[in-house]
Regions:
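Cap/insert and terminal regions of metallo-dependent hydrolase folds
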Residues: 113-212
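A short, charged, Gly/Pro-tolerant segment at domain boundaries
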Residues: 208-222
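Active-site neighborhood of phospho(di)ester-bond hydrolases with catalytic His/Asp-centered motifs
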Residues: 1, 22-29, 49-52, 103-107, ...
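Active-site metal-binding motif and surrounding structural segment of the metallo-beta-lactamase
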Residues: 3-50
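Active-site environment of divalent metal-dependent phosphoester hydrolases
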Residues: 30-34, 55-57, 87-88, 111-113, ...
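Glycine/small-residue-rich loop that forms an oxyanion/phosphate-binding "nest" at active or ligand-binding sites
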Residues: 35-89
Length: 237
């Protein structure tokens, strides 16, 4: 998690003022992901989109909106995806504006098949690629933590992420951003190569594959005439 000051500085680095933000979408309420939320929401009075269950952990919020399955923020249409993590009511999102769309899914042990159709053939995918299974099993993490990460309420491995992405991407897909890589149980090379091998096996191709880094903003991705700011600050969402 990062402080509100840090998030403000990183936004300003790419020419965005906090006052320009009109919504914060929460994926889940683990403390290390929402560290700066209280100060950020209080200082800038930005509406935070959460579930009623999330509110029990975020009861300090003053300006919040309960998530619906689908809703609009300005000219953006949001589709909410239920994820599976060891935090109550975790969520992912599809953000649509005109003909452009972004999928954002991290911190989940799997993706329910009922969402496959709506997740298919989007322009940009920000997808968790948390760990290499062999590195995790041979690493220093205790057994119970390894089991938690590998469980249906844990995190997507490189293999899982590549499997889902190879089935989701289509002719409209312009970019994949691999996110939430473990610093202890993964490498950028392993995550990238696992995805490339899976795409090659399925005879699919994506021109732009980006590895999101912790504590560093990700490059801007241009979709036709619109710019979407894609930042992966360490566990900031």
């Amino acid at each position: 998690g990062n402080s509100a000051k840090y998030v403000k500085e990183k936004l300003e680095d790419i020419g965005v003022e906090p006052e320009e933000i009109n919504a914060v979408l929460i994926t889940h309420t683990h403390v290390d992901h929402v560290k700066g939320l209280k100060v950020f929401e209080n200082k800038y009075n930005i509406p935070v989109y959460i579930t009623d269950v999330m509110l029990k952990s975020l009861d300090y919020l003053n300006n919040y909106v309960f998530l619906e399955n689908e809703f609009d923020i300005g000219d953006m249409h949001i589709i909410v995806i239920k994820t599976s993590h060891d935090a109550p009511d975790s969520r992912g999102y599809i953000i649509i504006s005109g003909d452009d769309s972004i999928v954002y899914i991290t911190d989940t042990g799997y993706i329910n098949k009922k969402y496959f159709d709506v997740l298919s053939n989007r322009n940009v995918y920000v997808m968790e690629s948390n760990h290499d299974i062999e590195m995790l099993n041979n690493g220093s993490y205790p057994f119970n933590l390894r089991q938690r990460i590998l469980s249906d309420k844990g995190h997507l491995s490189n293999y899982d992420s590549a499997k889902y992405l190879s089935s989701f991407i289509g002719n409209n897909t312009k970019c994949i951003i691999l996110a939430h890589l473990s610093e202890d149980n993964n490498t950028e090379e392993l995550a990238y190569n696992t995805l490339i091998e899976r795409l090659n096996d399925s005879d699919t191709h994506v021109d732009n594959i980006i590895i999101a880094k912790q504590n560093k903003e990700t490059e801007l991705v241009k979709l036709w005439l619109r710019l979407f700011v894609l930042e992966k600050l360490k566990k900031s969402i």
